[in-house]
Amino acid sequence: MSSYMYLRRIRVFAPLAALMTSGLLLLWGCSSSNPDLDFVAKDEPWRKQEENACLSANAVRPTSFIQTRSALGGPSLCGTEHPFEMSAADGGRVSMKPTALLRCPMIPQVDRWVAEVVEPAARHHIGAPLTELTVAASYACRSMNHVAGARLSEHGYANALDISVFKFADGSAISVKGGWYGSGRERAFLREVHDGTCRYFTTVLGPGYNAAHRDHLHLDRGPYRACR
């Protein structure tokens, strides 16, 4: 082998070796015509450790509204071994439609968020109890913001939840899309919910972030911190 070819191989494989020392980096679907399946995913041990700790602590107990489901796997690093299907929050008092598929550590945070942020905001601004959340998205194996070549979304790990509408006992409802720039009451409710959500999730994104989030609040427990 010539010295030129030897040096060329070093240049090609050295970056890959560096990636392997910091964690497995997977490129998935680079030739796919579907941008959702064209993403970069990194094997991060903390995810498995966090899930195991949640399960060992019995932080989530199956009920009529929180049920265990079969493992979600692939492609690439999508999924979780011990997902739960959540159809209501805060002890069953607030329904979630459609149901959400989430990993174990998300469930207690959603419960606390509903009980400690959304329900108090509903009583304060709406004067009626919260009864239902409209789930725009939970588990979905896709790239961030549906952009080809982006990182795997936290939705791909069942580690994110999107909420588009809040419904109340008096029959009224506030959608994120219509209410963010809606009446004073709607704006006040949604902004109090948005700001409070940042205490419970690492990343919270709404209409103020970009057009992709104009109609929902995104909340996740990923490694990046943002409240926008």
Named regions from a protein language model:
Residues 1-30:
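Sec-dependent bacterial lipoprotein signal peptides
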Residues 33-37, 81, 152, 157-228:
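Catalytic cores and adjacent binding grooves of peptidoglycan-active enzymes
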Residues 40, 99-109, 176-184:
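Second-shell loop/turn segments in exported
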